[in-house]
Amino acid sequence: MTTTQIIKPKRIAYYLRYCQNVHYFASIKPFLDYFISCGIHQNHVVVRRLAHGYQEIADYRGYTHLFTDDCDLVSYDLILTPTFLRDDEEGAQHLAVQIFHGMSDKPFTYQRNFSQYLLCLCAGQRQLDRLHSYECNHRMPATMVGYPKFDRIPANPPLYKNEKKAVIYCPTWRKGNMSSIELFLSNVDIIHVLAERYNLIVKPHPNIFNPEREFYESRIVAQLEQLPNIRLIRSGNVMGWFSQADLFVGDISASGYEWLYFNRPMVFLNPQPGVLKPSQDSNAWTYLWQCGPVCDNVRELPTLIANELNSDSYSDVRETVLHYSIFNPRGGTATQLAVAHILALLSSS
C-alpha cells in the first residue's frame, strides 16, 4: 500500500512593484514558468498599479492574465521578488525570497538589510561576499544557485542579415550619475561612424524607458528613437540579443556580467572620466572594468572597439570574473537548484 502526499495549493506572489519593470519579470520568469507547469499553486504577478497598455508589452505576452494590483503582500503564502522590499513593506519580509535581478556592482544593492528574508538566492560567491561585507547581512539566510537566465537563452530573430560584426551598447540607468547614455547621445557623429562600420544594437536599461521611475526623461527616449541605422531594443532579457553580438559596450551596467557568459570582447565607456577607474576590489563600482579597456574619451571609442575585435587579450580575466561571480555559470542548473529551495519553503509553510 502506498500513500500519496497531498500538496496544498499556495498563493505565490511574484512582486515586481512597477508594472513596466520588464527586467524584473525576466528574472522571475523561469520560476513562474515552472510553477505554472506544475498546475498546483496560484501564481500572481503583483504590481502596485496596472499601467495603461501593459497588455501590449512583448515580454508579458501570455502572462498578462496573471497580473494583479493586489499589493497586500502578507496575504500571500510566499513572495518571490527581484525588487527590494521597502520600509512600508517590512512586514512581508518573513515571506520573501530575494531573486536578485542582476549582478550589479552598485553598492546600494548590497547595503540593504536582508536578515529578515526567508532566503536570498545568490548568483555566486561575489554576490555573497558583497552582501556579507555589511554587518546587517552577516546572518542573512542565503545560498548560491547560479543565474537562471543562463539556463535557457531565447532564440530571438536576427536583427541584421549581413556579414558585419555586431556591437551592442548597454547603458545603465541614470541613478547616481553612473550612466554613459547622455555622453553617448551627445556625440552623434561617433554613433554614425559605429553604425556605418558595424551592426549597432542599442539596448538601454529598461528604467530609461519607464516614466514611473526616477530619472526618466522623455527627451532621452526621443533621442534614442531618432537614431538612424541602429536597432533599439526594449526588453527585460538581453541574453538572446547578446548571442547575436560580437562586442559589448557598457558602463556600470550589470548586464556586463551577463555578457561574460559568451566570453567575447568588452569596452567600457566611462561616465565619469578622471573619477572612476578600473579596480580589482570586488566591492568597487568598477570591478567588471578589468575585463576590457576603459574609454575615457568617447572620441576614441571607435578605435578601442576595432582594436578589441582584432585582438582580444582579456579572455582569461573575463573567465575568472565569471566563475567568481556566478556559480556553475554554464551548467544549466540554476533554475533547478533555486526551485528546490523554493519548494522546500513551500512545503514547510
How would you describe each model-predicted region?
Residues 13-154:
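Active-site and donor-binding regions of nucleotide-sugar-utilizing enzymes
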Residues 88-98, 236-278:
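A donor-sugar binding/catalytic signature common to diverse glycosyltransferases
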